[in-house]
Amino acid sequence: MKIFKRCFIGLTLTLSLLLAGPLFLAACAGLQDSGSWRTADRSSAGIAPRPEQEQAAVVQVYGARAYNWRGYFSLHTWISTKEAGADGYYVHEVTGWRHYVVRSRLDDPDRAWYGAPPTLIADIRGDQATRIIDQLDEVIARYPYPTEYTAWPGPNSNTFVAWVIRQIPEMDVALPNHAIGKDYLGNGVVSEVPGGSGYQLSLGGYFGILAGVREGLELNILGLSMGINPLALGIKLPGVGELAFRSTNPMHEPSGSNSEPETDAVPQTGAAGAAEAGQVSKKTL
């Protein structure tokens, strides 16, 4: 009886901790409905550089709160790219309302996601961005779930972005802990983290643990992740995301009229460090 009581108390405390963040966000929003997706804001946030102002290649990763109540728990992420000298951006993402869920199309790179403003997660420019773009079409064509979409625990839009990042050694980007689906590995159990320097163990996206230089430490329970990020001086809360003093992802810093390739401040190890430009990395076991 005591064992049952302890298990019940432990389960209650765990669920309370996991749901505290989403419930807090819901309370702050007043539990208001987001309205119709047809009329929700999809305008550009003006974050990405205009093509006429930036001649260099650009690769950016964005995230925005998922539509309606799902936004209390998770993000929708996507990749935006512009080739050197191009006059527009391509947006690469997964959506759940088509048979073929993957789409790459000309579009504004930083549009609001049905009322939710986007946040820039990573910004890579110059020669490094060109090398990433050169590999992107071939990598996207190999995405293993082109007609599958499951909001929880995956595969979903975050699964797609995390998978693409893992396949391109130079695209080492840590996704936010509340991007539910990023830890979905399909039939795999162990993988390198998207950030490139570290590993994770995941059981179908429901449970797992992650340790990486960019990501820090994360514990995944039922798709909701919590943890700490020593390099960013931050903590990770379910639903809320990472509260940190700095970003560990590559970010462009203006230094004149034209961009130079982003220099990585984080040491690269494993497959990411050993791979050369143009080589596809297979990081999931």
Where are these regions (language model features)?
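Mid-length scaffold segments of soluble, non-membrane domains
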Residues: R105-E170
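Glycine-rich catalytic cores of cysteine/serine-nucleophile enzymes that process amide/ester linkages
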Residues: L31-G46, R50-I124, P146-Y149, P230-V240
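Hydrophobic alpha-helical membrane-spanning segments
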Residues: C7-T14, C28, Q55-R65, W69-I79, ...
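Intrinsically disordered, glycine/charged-rich N-terminal periplasmic/extracytoplasmic linker segments
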Residues: W97-R98, T119-I133, Y184-P194
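Activation targets extended, charge/polar-rich intrinsically disordered C-terminal tails
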Residues: K2-S44, R142-L285
